[in-house]
Amino acid sequence: MQGILSIQSHVAYGHAGNSSAVFPMQRMGFEVWPIHTVQFSNHTQYQEGWTGRAFSADDISELVRGLNNIGALEKCQAVLTGYQGSAEQCLAVEETVTKVKQANPDALYVCDPVMGAPDKGCIVAPGIAENLLNRLMPMADVIVPNQFELSQFAEMEIHTLDDAIIACQRALAKGPKVVLVKHLYCLSDESFNMLLATQEGTYLAKRPHFEFAKAPVGAGDLISAIFTAGLLKGWTPKQAFQHCHDACYGVLNATYQAGEWELQTIAAQQEFVEPSKHFPLEEVTLKTVE
């Protein structure tokens, strides 16, 4: 039985981390083997707080050993990683990706390098950003950073579309074959912008921006998951990006229309199979937009 190994956070209530990523990939036809880096009652933006705990790096490695014992790693089509709770967890992920690639050289590694955002800066524990930037992102086939995380990896500030394109080119030169910028903040507050870059070209995706009273949590995890599933379907990065962008819009639209804070992943599940709205991609090059 082939599958996707997804190593990231988990919440019992709502949709963030694996709780946001696992079902969409299953709905798109893939078996998913989730390993949780933390397990919380709910996401951490609730003013009432949350309960739960982080797992150790040894917890992750132990589960991977068990999967290896039953021959699962050679059937692993992709490793998807998101939020890591410690520097040690990052090292366990690095070891896991290496083992999976040894067992199945065709397996993809998709790294969502959760570090922070422009308005918050780096929000992860000491050592995590360094391991993401120096170990996990360079070994990944695909990285899915936001603008802040891309700027950290490319070691440059991003203020314009040209900056973003150059940063993606720098990122591609460091090892990844595909860069999907899950949120490009610098262009406009009127639209939500994403960017895809490969050696073959760079594409900009724009969709309407929703004025949520409180921004939903877990949308980035959703983006990474749908894109991963699209690539495993044999779609080109551009095709997977198009589907991912349209499907995520559908989920966010359903969430907005329902007046909910938590992503309406279950109610909007048809979006993962057949998105209800299409937003054409724009191929961009340097100096396309000043």
Curated annotation (Swiss-Prot):
Q: Which GO terms describe its cellular component?
A: cytosol
> What reaction(s) does this enzyme catalyze?
pyridoxal + ATP = pyridoxal 5'-phosphate + ADP + H(+)
**CDD domains, per this entry?**
pyridoxal_pyridoxamine_kinase
- InterPro entries per UniProt: PM/HMP-P_kinase-1, PyrdxlKinase, Pyridoxal_kinase_PdxY, Ribokinase-like
* MF GO annotations: ATP binding; magnesium ion binding; pyridoxal kinase activity
Provide this UniProt record's keywords sorted from A to Z: ATP-binding, Kinase, Magnesium, Nucleotide-binding, Transferase
Q: Which cofactor does it need?
A: Mg(2+)
Q: How does it assemble?
A: Homodimer.
| Name this polypeptide is given | Pyridoxal kinase PdxY
The scientific name of the source species is Vibrio vulnificus (strain CMCP6)
